[in-house]
């Protein structure tokens, strides 16, 4: 059975209950918003939307970091992972928030320092702070992908 939500990018739409994620602590800077829908833009698109079900104007573009950084390994203490019911990062769906500048989409960046990990079974997620010093709040996606490919 679907749930109707209002979204910033697509207007009103139906989502399944399995698309609704709980963030008991909210996201960094948006702690008051606890429920988000994970919405695919288009089947062939790598981008997804993390849309607040509580505030229509709150939506983030997200992607799996492995798409542009194959060896992405956030450094997060195991004790923190237990907070969402996982023991290892590989047990989660890992996403990073993308910022796309309107004037030049080729300069889009990803917050690899603040990964969002989601327990695939319980659909409970949290935005963590990676202790890996090579991770950045604004990692250039196309540059990182080019370095990995070339």
UniProtKB/Swiss-Prot annotation:
Keywords: Bacterial flagellum biogenesis, Chaperone, Cytoplasm, Translation regulation. One of its GO terms (cellular component) is cytoplasm. The keyword Chaperone applies. It is found in: Cytoplasm. GO terms for biological process: bacterial-type flagellum assembly; regulation of translation. Acts as an anti-CsrA protein, binds CsrA and prevents it from repressing translation of its target genes, one of which is flagellin. Binds to flagellin and participates in the assembly of the flagellum. Interacts with translational regulator CsrA and flagellin(s). Belongs to the FliW family. This is Flagellar assembly factor FliW. It comes from Leptospira interrogans serogroup Icterohaemorrhagiae serovar Lai (strain 56601).
């Amino acid at each position: 059975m679907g749930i109707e939500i209002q979204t910033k990018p697509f207007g009103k739409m139906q989502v399944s209950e399995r698309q609704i994620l709980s963030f008991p602590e909210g996201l960094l800077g948006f702690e008051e918003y606890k429920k988000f829908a994970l919405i695919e833009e288009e089947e062939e698109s790598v981008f997804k939307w993390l849309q607040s079900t509580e505030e229509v104007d709150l939506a983030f573009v997200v992607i799996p970091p492995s798409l542009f950084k194959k060896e992405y390994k956030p450094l997060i203490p195991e004790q923190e992972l237990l907070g969402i019911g996982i023991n290892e990062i590989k047990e989660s769906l890992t996403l990073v928030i993308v910022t796309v500048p309107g004037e030049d989409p080729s300069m889009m960046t990803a917050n690899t320092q603040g990964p969002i990990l989601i327990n695939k079974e319980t659909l409970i997620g949290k935005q963590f702070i990676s202790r890996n010093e090579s991770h950045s709040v604004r990692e250039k996606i196309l540059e990182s992908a080019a370095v990995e490919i070339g």
